[in-house]
């Protein structure tokens, strides 16, 4: 299996990084494309270097290389994840505004009817944002903002990140076992009674 991973400049670079780590761990090949803003966000928010990220991906593409393999529908892959996804990137994807390889690869995923998952990072949202989300969804994208769940009783920031990353990879039917899944009220009640 091969998945394209795009990273925009939105806050939340750790989501893209953790996705790359998880995919590498389970042997999924990845094509990585990062915007220039993503590189700045990675440096600002994390201790990872761009070299570290390149080591996590099978292949790394320059944002301006619109002739790269992932810019063509004939290049086979299971789909694409943009994590994090800025509103600017959402807007370009929703409107097929192919100004760089990140957007072109997303547009190709949509036109080829492949999975495109967008980890949108913005709050609060105004009506224009909601309309862009609707338009992207109507075009075939899956909007999956990293909203934390608490039923698994997260104890660390990593627990919260891992739950969202697992939700993204569930879209590709990949089991990465990064957090405790919901097993039902029965087990919780049984544990409390002991």
Swiss-Prot record:
<feature type="binding site">
    <location>
        <position position="151"/>
    </location>
    <ligand>
        <name>dimethylallyl phosphate</name>
    </ligand>
</feature>
<dbReference type="InterPro" id="IPR003382">
    <property type="entry name" value="Flavoprotein"/>
</dbReference>
<keyword id="KW-0285">Flavoprotein</keyword>
<dbReference type="GO" id="GO:0016831">
    <property type="term" value="F:carboxy-lyase activity"/>
</dbReference>
<comment type="similarity">
    <text>Belongs to the UbiX/PAD1 family.</text>
</comment>
<feature type="binding site">
    <location>
        <begin position="86"/>
        <end position="89"/>
    </location>
    <ligand>
        <name>FMN</name>
    </ligand>
</feature>
<dbReference type="GO" id="GO:0106141">
    <property type="term" value="F:flavin prenyltransferase activity"/>
</dbReference>
<feature type="binding site">
    <location>
        <begin position="9"/>
        <end position="11"/>
    </location>
    <ligand>
        <name>FMN</name>
    </ligand>
</feature>
<feature type="binding site">
    <location>
        <position position="167"/>
    </location>
    <ligand>
        <name>dimethylallyl phosphate</name>
    </ligand>
</feature>
<comment type="function">
    <text>Flavin prenyltransferase that catalyzes the synthesis of the prenylated FMN cofactor (prenyl-FMN) for 4-hydroxy-3-polyprenylbenzoic acid decarboxylase UbiD. The prenyltransferase is metal-independent and links a dimethylallyl moiety from dimethylallyl monophosphate (DMAP) to the flavin N5 and C6 atoms of FMN.</text>
</comment>
<protein>
    <recommendedName>
        <fullName>Flavin prenyltransferase UbiX</fullName>
        <ecNumber>2.5.1.129</ecNumber>
    </recommendedName>
</protein>
<dbReference type="InterPro" id="IPR036551">
    <property type="entry name" value="Flavin_trans-like"/>
</dbReference>
<keyword id="KW-0637">Prenyltransferase</keyword>
<keyword id="KW-0288">FMN</keyword>
<feature type="binding site">
    <location>
        <position position="121"/>
    </location>
    <ligand>
        <name>FMN</name>
    </ligand>
</feature>
<keyword id="KW-0808">Transferase</keyword>
<feature type="binding site">
    <location>
        <position position="35"/>
    </location>
    <ligand>
        <name>FMN</name>
    </ligand>
</feature>
<comment type="function">
    <text>Involved in the carboxylation of phenylphosphate.</text>
</comment>
<dbReference type="Pfam" id="PF02441">
    <property type="entry name" value="Flavoprotein"/>
</dbReference>
<dbReference type="InterPro" id="IPR004507">
    <property type="entry name" value="UbiX-like"/>
</dbReference>
């Amino acid at each position: 299996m091969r998945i394209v991973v795009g990273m925009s400049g939105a806050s939340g670079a750790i989501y893209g990084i953790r996705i790359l780590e998880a995919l590498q761990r389970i042997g999924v090949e990845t094509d990585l494309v990062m915007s220039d803003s993503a590189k700045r966000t990675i440096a600002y928010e994390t201790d990872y270097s761009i070299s570290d990220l390149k080591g996590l991906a099978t292949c790394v593409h320059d944002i301006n290389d619109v002739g790269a393999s992932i810019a063509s529908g004939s290049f086979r892959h299971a789909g694409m994840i943009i994590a994090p996804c800025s509103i600017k990137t959402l807007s370009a994807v929703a409107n097929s505004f192919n100004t760089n390889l990140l957007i072109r690869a997303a547009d190709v995923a949509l036109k080829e009817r492949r999975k495109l998952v967008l980890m949108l990072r913005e709050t609060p949202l105004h009506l224009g944002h909601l309309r862009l989300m609707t338009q992207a969804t109507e075009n075939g994208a899956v909007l999956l903002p990293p909203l934390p769940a608490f039923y698994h009783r997260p104890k660390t920031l990593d627990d919260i990140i891992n739950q969202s990353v697992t939700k993204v990879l569930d879209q590709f039917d990949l089991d990465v076992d990064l957090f405790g899944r919901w097993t039902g009220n029965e087990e919780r009640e049984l544990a409390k009674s002991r």
